[in-house]
Structures are given as C-alpha cells and as structure tokens.
Amino acid sequence: MGWMKDETGLDKRDANYRALTPLSHLRRAAKVFPKKTALVYGDFRASYTQYHDRCTRLASGLAQLGVTSGDVVATLLPNIPAQAEAHFGIPACGAVLNTINTRLDKGTIAYIFDHGEAKVALVDTQFLPSVEAAIAEMESDGPLIIEVPDAAADYPASGRYQTYDALLESGDAAFEWIMPADEWESLALNYTSGTTG
C-alpha cells in the first residue's frame, strides 16, 4: 500500500486499534430485518438478506480474481446498487474501497488509479470512455475493469469487459467475510476532488 508510506507517528495504542468495523452493520440488518427492503433503484428491489448475499458474492468474486487483503478496488459509479454493495463487498474480501468522483478528468483518474494502486475498478458503462482514456495515459497496465451496466439509465453493457452481474454470479454465497483484525486495517481510500477550498 504505497499510499500509506508517508504516514508516520501513528503507532498502535489501546485507544486506536480495537477491532471496530461497519461491516457488522449489514450482517446484523440481514438477521434482524431479513425481508425489509434495503435497496431501491428503478425496478430493482433488494431485501437486507439479498443485499448481504450480493455483497458476499461480490467479495467472493473479487477474491476469485486474485484480490487479497490490502488490495485497492476502485469504483466509478453513480448512486446505484452496485455502489452500495461495493461499500460492504469490497472490504468483506479484505480489500480497500476507493470511490472515485465520476466528474473527474482522465488525468486525475489516472493519477488516482496509479497512486492508489487500484487492482480492479468497478466502472459504470457511461464512464468507460473516461476510464479507458485514463488507463491509456498510465505507464502501468491500470486496473482490471469490471463493467457495471445501468439499464435503468439506458446504459447497456458494451460487451468489452466482464460485467458486474457475471462477477456476482461467479461468487460463492457461503464466502466467509474477512473482518478487520483491528482499526489499523484500511477500509476505504478517498481522494479530494479539489472542491474543499
């Protein structure tokens, strides 16, 4: 994790390394509210049980792609179910979620991919041109693209990449989530968009 190399003076202390994680929230919700609606997008509906299952399959699918603990998985997605699932599914395989602002230019996207060392990127079909242009500018190969079609917004799959649904279908619903050992394990990696002044 090259982006952590600049952090100093953050030694583990009793107050800062206990195992606290938001991953347990969804597991609890799936047990307490199994049939309650958790996600709504267009005609898509998912209960908390289904939401948990989809996150588990995402974690398993990513693990099958070789994503391991500490690897970065980027997303360029609007507010759709795949983004909500990424918030749990990516950390559930031990990886670090890197949500990238969809309004960024190709140079900034390339910088974030490179600096964050993204191994995989979940990309909405509408953002493929920006991501492909960003990867073309990179000296490294860039992340593996998993395409997230959005039929509700009239963005069908391009046919050039493995789709998000195919990744979920490849996942194991019995995959054991990899919970953080302590608070020092990264869950997310965020970059400013330059809008904070």
Identify the meaning behind each predicted range.
Residues 35-80, 84-88, 105-110, 160, ...:
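Conserved AMP-binding/adenylate-forming core of the ANL superfamily
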Residues 16-38:
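A short N-terminal helical cap/helix-turn-helix that marks the beginning
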Residues 64-65, 92-169:
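Structural core segment of the AMP-binding/adenylate-forming
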Residues 47-49, 187-197:
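Conserved AMP-binding A3 loop
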